[in-house]
């Protein structure tokens, strides 16, 4: 587990630099690294009663991919948290986090449907431009896996 800290503090910067270094070390050893680019669990909009949407993806993953010239395997996780979780997500971050643990425990031992895309090798990824363009490209690749 490589922690990513979204706070705007010196400690967060140190944590994120170290996590990026470790990710690059793992990739150099051909050890796969799984990254959730939004850094958050998807949440239903409209106070928990709308469509489930990802938080905006950060360019952190794109930076690591570009530095390592890594191959990417897009993965889409199907699943749905409870309505209670989605409503709480709009009320209180501590409540959301507490319920996230509950949601994980609720699914313990259950089968989760996962779609795994074809590997996208560095030469194809390099054509996507800068970090933002690469992030947008990868987002679309993952979302394409969600389609029936």
Question: Model-found features: residue ranges?
Answer:
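Non-catalytic C-terminal accessory region of glycerolipid acyltransferases
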Residues: 13, 17-148
